[in-house]
Amino acid sequence: MRIFGIDCGSEITGYGIVECPDGTPRSGQPDLRLIAFGGIRPAKKLTLAERLAFVHRELLTQLAAHQPDLVAVEEVFYSVNAKSALKLGHVRGVALLAAATAGLPIAEYAPLTIKSTVTGYGLAQKEQVQFMVARLLHMPEPPEPADAADALAIAICHIHHAQTIQAQQSR
């Protein structure tokens, strides 16, 4: 199973690809393999429409290059700043469109679920998420940018939840 996680952002959209071969080791923890990660940074001088088009093109390029089985994204969350939330919603829409254009299924997870799955604590700070992502993926240092670490966390979250569902269905 190869999962493409996307962390939508108004300035940087992080992506991360994690693979989990079939089967789970005796420890009960999935055997995770890092494939790739990065951040999509459209130029600030571009208009909103141009920035969205840039993110869309880059996501389609990465999806084609890495051939995932599924795209996992963070669910919409509520923000005090309506303008920021609206911009984030635009980017999220572009990410969902890219996944749909590529013909891929989409899974969505709440921020608390992602953090809880990866760190064991739903209110974990960004640094804690980065640390645990690095540890789970056997990386020498936490991934940068932080948006890429969040995207990897989203992918890891899906793998854990998919394996839990498979285990329950096989009972």
Curated annotation (Swiss-Prot):
- Would you kindly state one Gene Ontology biological process term found in this protein's UniProt entry? DNA recombination
The record lists the catalysed reaction(s) as: Endonucleolytic cleavage at a junction such as a reciprocal single-stranded crossover between two homologous DNA duplexes (Holliday junction)
- State a single Gene Ontology molecular function: magnesium ion binding
User: Needs which cofactor?
Assistant: Mg(2+)
Can you tell me which residues form the catalytic site? Answer: 7, 74, 147
Q: Where does Mg(2+) 1 bind?
A: 7, 147
The alphabetized UniProt keywords are: Cytoplasm, DNA damage, DNA recombination, DNA repair, DNA-binding, Endonuclease, Hydrolase, Magnesium, Metal-binding, Nuclease
| Co-factor binding comment | Binds 2 Mg(2+) ion per subunit.
State the EC number(s): 3.1.21.10
Q: Where in the cell is it found?
A: Cytoplasm
Show the Pfam families listed in the entry.
RuvC
Q: Where does Mg(2+) 2 bind?
A: 74
* One GO cellular component term noted in the UniProt record for this chain: Holliday junction resolvase complex
Q: Name the NCBIfam families for this protein.
A: ruvC (TIGR00228)
Question: Which HAMAP family does this UniProt record tie to the protein?
Answer: RuvC
Free-text function comment from the UniProt entry: The RuvA-RuvB-RuvC complex processes Holliday junction (HJ) DNA during genetic recombination and DNA repair. Endonuclease that resolves HJ intermediates. Cleaves cruciform DNA by making single-stranded nicks across the HJ at symmetrical positions within the homologous arms, yielding a 5'-phosphate and a 3'-hydroxyl group; requires a central core of homology in the junction. The consensus cleavage sequence is 5'-(A/T)TT(C/G)-3'. Cleavage occurs on the 3'-side of the TT dinucleotide at the point of strand exchange.
* Self-association state and partner proteins as the record states: Homodimer which binds Holliday junction (HJ) DNA. The HJ becomes 2-fold symmetrical on binding to RuvC with unstacked arms; it has a different conformation from HJ DNA in complex with RuvA. In the full resolvosome a probable DNA-RuvA(4)-RuvB(12)-RuvC(2) complex forms which resolves the HJ.
Family affiliation:
Belongs to the RuvC family.
Q: What is this protein called?
A: Crossover junction endodeoxyribonuclease RuvC
* Source species of the chain: Acidobacterium capsulatum (strain ATCC 51196 / DSM 11244 / BCRC 80197 / JCM 7670 / NBRC 15755 / NCIMB 13165 / 161)
Which gene is transcribed and translated to give this protein?
A: ruvC
